[in-house]
């Protein structure tokens, strides 16, 4: 039997040893005596090796180290002897076997199982968009051409031109649209053989915010991290880079919009490692999928050569209903919660965003379990977050002196969030939580934890359940971290920095922190804040917030501000009444996803501006309905705009 026919590592090992000439076999045993064979294992003694024939040596190595490690041991010796042809043949067997080892590793990832990624999954809507040709075009990323829905299976397809198959895909979407869940689901589906069968030998998931934990800024270390194995056969994995797919999840968490304004001016070595991949300087023939929020596109675009752009739009109406059924284990609770949401246009529309849908479900479940009647009517995503936070903050005791008193915990969460964003940090050690007087395990509604292997040690790190919670508490920090009599010098400086960076970055949408703070600064939000979080906003502080609101609204209306919708035909009249849009055309495209054939999916990109002061126009988006042109447009002066929601990672549901 030739080695190429070997089906198992033990068979390949035996044939590799048997192929050695007598003198080479003696040399291999000599090198094995002095070699550090496996972590924690002593070298083989001369007496153990003396007189052994190939089959005996194979049995000895397998009994001491197991099949896979035994192959690695022999490979080390053969490399020292420079028997590269035999190394190549044996490596191929090792690689083929390691694919299955890695697939099993992915299938068993505990944190993904807990997040429900491998269980009930709700589909999200994806549409293809062209790559942006210039930074200015980012404000109007849907040029005048047909936008088509795209499936995950077809992300790297070229249609009828195989030579033009994209090797780099940018998946962009607002916070909470389901990018992380989709990215992880792709890796799991590949591992189970249902996605890209035969196309990729390895699909690696890289969380951009976790790259900081790499021990070294080397590609080898990144692969060890992805495989969860410091002995992974890196050389063999990289032998055919065109059969590798790296999913870089959360580019916006690697490089935040305010990065250059803070203490961090240059790229860290670990960021540079990912930049080399993105620029195609490292492994230029591998495939890449990069997920990001729109804000980071201005930083990402200069790194790209040719990329396919895909936009994630969140849930369809059917998926919204399915999500409630999967989230609530009690059918009556699910029906009651969905009924509440359906009767509230703001909640129903917000639940198109999977992350906000999770927040709404968690909030409603918390209210029901406490026996409370839901009387609130949230007006925007900020109100939804306030309702969630006020529900899950620990209650004040009668004396107001509890270590977990409501206001103390709120202030601590705010200070942790602000410190993290100001220093470009999204992972926190337990010592950092203690510094802010936070007890991580008792605040699972806001903080999640994971254990990471750092060298020989295992360390626990915390993060906010989603970056949107960190943004929310960052916005709240301007109200609670000082003496509360005024916004405070430090807070005023930070707010001014927000405004300055916003002005310098031109047409970018506002950050989520700014959106939260703008909503909070509205006068009718003050009483809601005071009631929910047990602190009073002084007249001076209210005046400071009013000034910020005026500045922010002025800046917003002096620029083209992108607003993305996924609409259904029945919602058009409400949309036109709710906001005025400039140079907008609607693309109507029949969707088989709808329950009724009379309803059709709308994908809209609009440009909001301040009439005559508008500096940039977005071209119309044209489409067809069953072969006939059906274009509706309006050219009225823009007057309002709303930010977008957030993404969340639950304990055992979709997000």
UniProtKB/Swiss-Prot annotation:
Residue ranges constituting the Pyrin domain according to the UniProt record: 1-96
InterPro entries per the UniProt record, alphabetical: DAPIN, DEATH-like_dom_sf, NACHT_NTPase, NLRP_innate_immun_reg, NOD1/2_WH, P-loop_NTPase
Tissue: Highly expressed in basal and suprabasal epidermal cell layers with lower levels in dermal fibroblast cells (at protein level). Widely expressed with highest levels in heart, brain and skeletal muscle. Also expressed in liver, colon, dermis and epidermis. Little expression detected in myeloid cells or peripheral blood mononuclear cells.
Domain NACHT: 167-484
Residues holding ATP: 173-180
SMART domains listed in its UniProt record: PYRIN
Keywords for this protein: Adaptive immunity, ATP-binding, Cell membrane, Cytoplasm, Immunity, Inflammatory response, Innate immunity, Membrane, Nucleotide-binding
Location in the cell: Cytoplasm; Cell membrane
Assembly with partners or alone: Oligomerizes. Interacts with PYCARD. Also interacts with CASP1 and IL1B. Interacts with NOD1 and components of the NOD1 signaling pathway including RIPK2, NR2C2/TAK1 and IKBKG/NEMO.
PANTHER family xrefs: NACHT, LRR AND PYD DOMAINS-CONTAINING PROTEIN 10 (PTHR45690:SF4), NACHT, LRR AND PYD DOMAINS-CONTAINING PROTEIN 12 (PTHR45690)
Function: Inhibits autoprocessing of CASP1, CASP1-dependent IL1B secretion, PYCARD aggregation and PYCARD-mediated apoptosis but not apoptosis induced by FAS or BID. Displays anti-inflammatory activity. Required for immunity against C.albicans infection. Involved in the innate immune response by contributing to pro-inflammatory cytokine release in response to invasive bacterial infection. Contributes to T-cell-mediated inflammatory responses in the skin.
Assigned protein family: Belongs to the NLRP family.
Protein name as it appears in the record: NACHT, LRR and PYD domains-containing protein 10
Organism of provenance: Homo sapiens
Organism lineage string: Eukaryota, Metazoa, Chordata, Craniata, Vertebrata
């Amino acid at each position: 039997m030739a080695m190429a026919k070997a089906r198992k590592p033990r068979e390949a090992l035996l044939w590799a040893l048997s192929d050695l000439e007598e003198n080479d076999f003696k040399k291999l045993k000599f090198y094995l005596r002095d070699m550090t064979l496996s972590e924690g294992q002593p070298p083989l003694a001369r007496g153990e090796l003396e007189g052994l024939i190939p089959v005996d040596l194979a049995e000895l190595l397998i009994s001491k180290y197991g099949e896979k490690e035994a192959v690695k041991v022999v490979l080390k010796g053969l490399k020292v002897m420079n028997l590269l042809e035999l190394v190549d043949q044996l490596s191929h067997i090792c690689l083929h076997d390691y694919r299955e080892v890695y697939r099993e590793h992915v299938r068993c990832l505990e944190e993904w199982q807990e997040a429900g990624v491998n269980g009930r999954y709700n589909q999200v809507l994806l549409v293809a968009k062209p790559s942006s040709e210039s930074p200015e075009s980012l404000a109007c990323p849907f040029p005048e051409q047909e936008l088509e829905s795209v499936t995950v299976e077809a992300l790297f397809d070229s249609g009828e031109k195989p030579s033009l198959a994209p090797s780099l895909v940018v998946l962009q979407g607002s916070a909470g649209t389901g990018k992380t869940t989709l990215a992880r689901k792709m890796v799991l589906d590949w591992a189970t053989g249902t996605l890209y069968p035969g196309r990729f030998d390895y699909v690696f998931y890289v969380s951009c915010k976790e790259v900081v934990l790499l021990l070294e800024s080397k590609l080898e270390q990144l692969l060890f991290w992805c495989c969860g194995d410091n002995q992974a056969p890196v050389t063999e994995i990289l032998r055919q880079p065109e059969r590798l797919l790296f999913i870089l999840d959360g580019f916006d968490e690697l490089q935040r919009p305010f990065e250059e304004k803070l203490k961090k001016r240059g790229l860290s070595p670990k960021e540079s490692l990912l930049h080399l991949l993105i620029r195609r300087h490292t492994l230029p023939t591998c495939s890449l999928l990069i997920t990001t929020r729109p804000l980071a596109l201005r930083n990402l675009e200069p790194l790209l050569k040719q990329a396919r752009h895909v936009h994630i739009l969140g849930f369809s109406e059917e998926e919204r209903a399915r999500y409630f059924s999967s989230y609530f284990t009690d059918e009556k609770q699910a029906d009651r919660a969905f009924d509440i949401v359906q009767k509230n246009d703001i909640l129903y529309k917000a639940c198109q965003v999977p992350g906000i849908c999770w927040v709404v479900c968690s909030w409603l479940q918390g209210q029901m379990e406490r026996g409370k009647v839901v009387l609130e009517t949230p007006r925007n995503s900020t109100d939804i977050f306030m309702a969630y936070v006020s529900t899950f903050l620990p209650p004040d005791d009668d004396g107001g002196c509890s270590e977990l008193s409501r206001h103390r915990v709120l202030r601590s969460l705010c200070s942790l969030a602000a410190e993290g964003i100001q220093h470009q940090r999204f992972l926190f050690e337990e010592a950092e939580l203690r510094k802010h007087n936070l007890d991580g395990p008792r605040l699972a509604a806001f903080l999640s934890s994971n254990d990471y292997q750092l060298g020989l040690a295992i360390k626990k790190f915390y993060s906010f359940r989603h970056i949107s919670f960190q943004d929310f508490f960052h916005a709240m920090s301007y109200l609670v971290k000082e003496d509360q009599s005024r916004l405070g010098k430090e807070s005023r400086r930070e707010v001014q920095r927000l405004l300055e960076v916003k002005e310098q970055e031109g047409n970018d949408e506002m950050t989520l922190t700014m959106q939260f703070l703008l909503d909070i600064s509205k006068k009718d939000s003050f009483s809601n804040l005071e009631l929910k979080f047990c602190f009073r906003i002084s007249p001076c502080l209210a005046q400071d917030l009013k000034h910020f609101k005026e500045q922010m609204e002025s800046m917003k209306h002096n620029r083209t501000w992108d607003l993305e919708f996924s609409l259904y035909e029945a919602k058009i009249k409400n949309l036109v009444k709710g906001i005025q849009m400039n140079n907008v055309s609607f693309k109507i495209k029949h969707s088989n996803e709808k329950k009724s054939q009379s309803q059709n999916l709308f994908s809209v990109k609009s440009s909001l501006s301040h009439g005559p002061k508008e500096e940039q126009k977005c071209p119309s988006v044209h489409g067809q309905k069953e072969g006939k042109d059906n274009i509706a447009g309006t050219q009225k002066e823009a007057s309002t705009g709303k930010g977008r929601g957030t993404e969340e990672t639950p304990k055992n549901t979709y997000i």
